[in-house]
Amino acid sequence: IRNLRAAIQNPQDYTARSNLMWAATMAENRLIKLGKRTDFECHQMEHQLGAYINCNHGEGLAVLHPVYYRHIYKYGLPKFKRFATEVWGVSADGRTDEEIAFAGVEALADFIKEIGLPTTLRELGVIRQTDLKKIADTVAIVPGSYKQMSHEEILEIFKECY
């Protein structure tokens, strides 16, 4: 987060850009995920979205992740609480674990807006809300996610993102 903010502020900041590339490499090769429970369902949702509207994967995830996380954070509460406190610096003082986790999801949504990424499916090129069911029905539902989604729940997430 710190490096992305620095790189946006100064695109010539070689250290910030190098650190971003290293972090992206670690995230993409899945080395840091070994032995840990992860959730890939939002990526499955975005793959289908991208197939229909040809959007950039990262921009699609920027739109989907906050809404998706609002639907699942209670099912992965320890990890979402840690995400909130460690990544976003959310204070635990006087808050329940659920409140802390939710504050982290909202911090992510705020950050996405701060850096100028799209926040709605309309911004990505989804013209008609009626297209959402067709897209949702083609999403592969993968095992191992914090909450097993149905196609109806995926459609609801798409509608909230519209």
Q: Language-model segments: what does each one mean?
A:
Residues 1-106:
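Active-site segments that bind and position negatively charged phosphate/pyrophosphate groups
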Residues 91-162:
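C-terminal charged capping/lid subdomain of soluble metabolic enzymes
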